[in-house]
Each structure stands twice: as C-alpha cells, then as structure tokens.
Design a protein with these regions (language model features):
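Short catalytic helix/loop segments, enriched in acidic residues and glycine
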Residues: 1-14
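Short glycine-enriched loops at secondary-structure junctions
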Residues: 29-30, 72-78, 127-129
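Glycine-rich loop at the start of a catalytic domain that most often binds anionic cofactors/ligands
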Residues: 31-44
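A glycine-rich helix N-cap at a beta->alpha junction
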Residues: 41-62
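Short hydrophobic/aromatic-enriched beta-strand-loop microsegments
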Residues: 46-49, 139-147
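Short, charged, surface-exposed secondary-structure boundary motifs
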Residues: 57-60, 150-158
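Active-site glycine-rich loop that binds ribose-phosphate moieties when present
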Residues: 91-116, 125-128
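C-terminal accessory domains and tails appended to enzymatic cores
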Residues: 161-175
C-alpha cells in the first residue's frame, strides 16, 4: 500500500506541476505520518513527515501562503459503511461532530485550510469521501479510486488511479 499511496501522491504533484504550480509541500499524514517513500516522489517537492507541534494535526504546516490543498488517499469517516478504513483521526473515535455535522478527516482538514482561506482543490480516495467532498464543496474535483463493500473494497486498477489523479490534479490547479 505504501508504494501505491506514494504513486498516487506523486501523480497529484505531477499534475499540479504541469498546471504551473512552482512549490509543493507534501504532508505525510496517515498513521505514523511516515508512510510515503520520499525517493519515489518528484524531486521538486518538500515533504513534512511525522507529527508537528501545532494544532492542525494532518494539516501541520499550513498557512496563508498556500494557494490550494489537495487531499490524496482519503477515506470515509467513522460511523459509515463506505470504506473498511472508515475512522476519524484514530480508531478510538466513534464519532466526531462539528455543529451537528459528521466530521470526517476531510471535513476537519477542510476547515483547517479554510482558517487560512486555502481552498481544497482535489480529493482522492473512496467513493464515500468523494461524495462527501462534493456535498461540502460542489465545485471540488474528486477522483474515487475505490468503494466500500462490507469489510472490503473494490478498487480500480492502480495504474488507472494514478492516471486519473494526475489528470484531475492538473485540471484542479489550472482551474
């Protein structure tokens, strides 16, 4: 899974660069925050690994200097049947709500970006999280690469996922 996640992140970076992005900071933000394989990422990126000391958790390092955010490899929130990985921040959280809204990592991280007026341009991951992204922001670009099926998932081919992510990242950044 590390190699595929790294390929998907690299594809998003390549699409962003193709659209004219000059600077990219990758926040490795799943589990140990040391999942991505840096040597397999584009040489022009910077990568933030591990957990920062600020309150933004998965969005550590964000500030008003960012023109946009891309979320790759996201999954549905806890209390859903949309992904076998569904949880919010950690497996101990049964449910997180903000103003009565089921708050997935997508919602929490979108709000963190909004604190600095940074738009979320693209979300990739399971179908459930992509549908939630569209409800949250109808103009957002999404790439569903899998869909939940009980305790399993059905995914598109890994190479097709990479292709779609690169294409949509370029479109999202250019837009």
């Amino acid at each position: 899974f590390r190699h595929q996640m790294t390929r998907e992140v690299a594809a998003a970076c390549e699409g962003a660069f193709a659209a004219g992005c000059e600077d990219l900071l990758i926040k490795d933000a799943h589990d140990s925050a040391r999942n991505l394989i840096p040597a397999e990422l584009p040489e022009r990126v910077s990568i933030f690994r591990g957990w920062g000391s600020d309150i933004h958790s998965m969005m550590s390092g964000i500030d008003a200097s960012f023109a946009g955010a891309i979320f790759t490899g996201y999954h549905s929130s806890s209390n859903t049947d949309a992904s076998p990985l569904c949880h919010t921040m950690n497996l101990d959280n049964v449910s997180i709500r903000i103003n009565g809204i089921q708050a997935s990592e997508l919602v929490i991280n979108t709000f963190a970006a909004a604190l600095y007026d940074v738009p979320v341009l693209l979300v990739t991951g399971d179908l459930g999280v992509c549908e939630q992204a569209k409800r949250l922001c109808p103009a957002i670009y999404t790439v569903p690469v899998s869909r939940g099926c009980g305790n399993g998932s059905i995914s598109i081919h890994p190479a097709e996922a990479v292709k779609r992510i690169r294409e949509k990242a370029e479109m999202a950044v250019a837009d």
